[in-house]
Amino acid sequence: MNIENINTLGELVKSGYKSKSIKDELRENLISKMMSKETVFKGIHGYENSVIPELERAILSKHNINLLGLRGQAKTRLARLMVNLLDEYIPVVEGSEINDDPLNPISRFAKELINEKGDETPIYWLHRSERFAEKLATPDVTVADIIGDVDPIKAANLKLSYADDRVIHYGMIPRANRCIFVINELPDLQARIQVALFNILQEGDIQIRGFKLRLPLDMQFVFTANPEDYTNRGSIVTPLKDRIGSQILTHYPEDIETAKTITKQETDKASAQKEFIQVPELARDLLEQIVFEARESEFIDAKSGVSARLSITAFENLLSTAERRALLSGDSKTMIRLNDFDGIIPAITGKVELVYEGEQEGAQVVAETLIKNAIKTLFPTYFPEIKKLEKQSAETPYDDIISWFFNADEDFELLDEHTEQEYKNELDKITPLNAFLEKHQPNMNTVDGYFVKEFILWALVEFKKLSKHRFAEGTQFRDPYGNFMSGL
């Protein structure tokens, strides 16, 4: 059907166009995509076997949907991607405030226009990208905002009495007729406003200021909400929950690979930095492990959640830390160092909600602890495990490295201002590290190897095999008894 040649109601009827409800559109287009094995929700990772099948079932059932989950779980993005399941264009009566269907008008304006002009009634075609409306539920939202109200200025200009329904100013919901309408953070909507949604969800009509006005709106509602026990500002009233067809629980990525995919997708915009900053795979793993540690931490409120935005902003900070270092040292290319992870602490402290014990420790200490715990968790997946209880005489794969520090003439320091070559030269001084890497990670990329060497040193500190001291200009590593001996 060539929509460019269809500009009036008569031409639309001749074309054989048949109108259908928005929920039928979503259902039919979903079926078509599923049959052709097309990816429906592109850019959503980790939900393939959990959330997406439930969402598809809800669409097939023609339900209004509530996406329930913690912060940063792609709830709003899922709702926005549903637009791709709509028909590309639909006809609308020209001049209609509420997107009237020319074949099934519901407003007084559209009905009178069609009665007056008949087949010559002008129409225009609305693209699916314009069929998405979104409202963030805030405590100051009123019924007039979302449903509508009497407009006294309109009444005065048109010289109409308040008894005439033409004085109505429609709110966001009627104006989103034949659209997907999303209300974010539904529990924040006052209970009396939630009550105003009852009729729309069940009967599809609205009531404005006592007008006996029946508008059978055709809409797909999607709500998003945090779990009630976390949202202190309110809850979803029970009769409203009863009218929402499907409630779908979202979740965080369940493994590091999925989390890495999400972070990479969301940070690909920073391509200018990536041209001269190399990011070892281990650094990506470590960054995601920090977020996983945060979700399990006793210092962080689990009910609040740890958003996927943490790993995204932390990765951006990590790149910027390396970029700043390279600019100051004059390096044209650089790679991520473990010292650079100090730069992600502001991203962590701004994204986590601490419990009482965490407040006592302090946000900075909690963030540093998360980095240390992530190193301890990841280390055994790459290298031999360091057991807590070992016989004093037992040999370990790390003995040569530890002995090097014991016999070193001076403390080993990695300065923040080291150029790339100076950094590599310093790590190359620890000759046992090279032999250790060749034995346990023979396929390791040579350049990534320097980050891995530093990672080994940090891990040995966490397992009490070495000691580490952070000072203003960098980090100092020494034999575990070095601090004790220097104090004598």
Question: Positions of the model-derived regions?
Answer:
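Short alpha-helical scaffolding segments that buttress acidic/His motifs in well-ordered protein cores
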Residues: 263, 287-291
